[in-house]
Amino acid sequence: RGQRGRTWQGATGLDLMASIVLLPERMRAVAQFTLAKAAALAVRDLVADVFRSEDLDVARIRIKGPNDILVDRHKLAGILIANEIKGEHVRSSIVGIGINVNSSTWEGVDATSLLLETRRGQDLHLLLSRLCMHMDHWWGLTGKDDAAIAAAYTDALWAKDRYTDFTLDGRRITARPLDVDDMGRLIIEEVGGEVAAYGLERLRFLM
């Protein structure tokens, strides 16, 4: 379970579900979304590894802000993060990661899995090892090169700079994602040129 009561549903023994505990040394609370970016990029890189091994197009793998991983328009992975804040700093962070690996059916969810994309089953232990490797890479950049993390995350955003449909406070709009701000809100530009940042409680993709 993550922030705002969000949960991940996965099939035991078929899908990869992992919790990674991080203990930042000097991360300020205002910069905590960098952790979410690092985790999303680690999962994106893991999925890209699998795609490359099967000669599939890695450009189909995108991040739907703040931290879902899509293949085309179908959800393949999600990340749930719970941070413990003490004063002005992040004391600890639990990063929950769920990846659809060997599942093939879901109820009420537009999803996909590595099995469906590659037409072959995947070894969960091997995937976990590679996930930790990629997480170690991006986590190692936090506080040292946050700009590189931000640039990679922005570049991987789903529908970036492309007009698509959203609902804003229940009202349908057409806008294009530009970036995310330090609070994890998606920055969009509406057709009329208005630029603003919104959180998930107000802004929803229409998939």
Predicted regions mapped to residue ranges:
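Conserved beta-strand residues within beta-sheet cores
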Residues: 66, 73-78, 150, 161-163, ...
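Short, acidic (Asp/Glu-rich) active-site segment that either coordinates a divalent metal cofactor
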Residues: 88-118
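Detector for glycine-centered tight turns/loop "hinges" at secondary-structure junctions
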Residues: 2-5, 73, 119, 170, ...
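Contiguous, small/hydrophobic- and glycine-enriched helical/loop subdomains that border
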Residues: 1-90, 121-133, 137-144
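A secondary-structure boundary/capping signal
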Residues: 65-66, 97, 199
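Short, acidic Gly/Pro/Ser/Thr-rich loop/turn segments
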Residues: 1, 25, 101-104, 185
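Conserved RNA-binding domains used in RNP assembly and mRNA/RNA metabolism
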Residues: 160-207
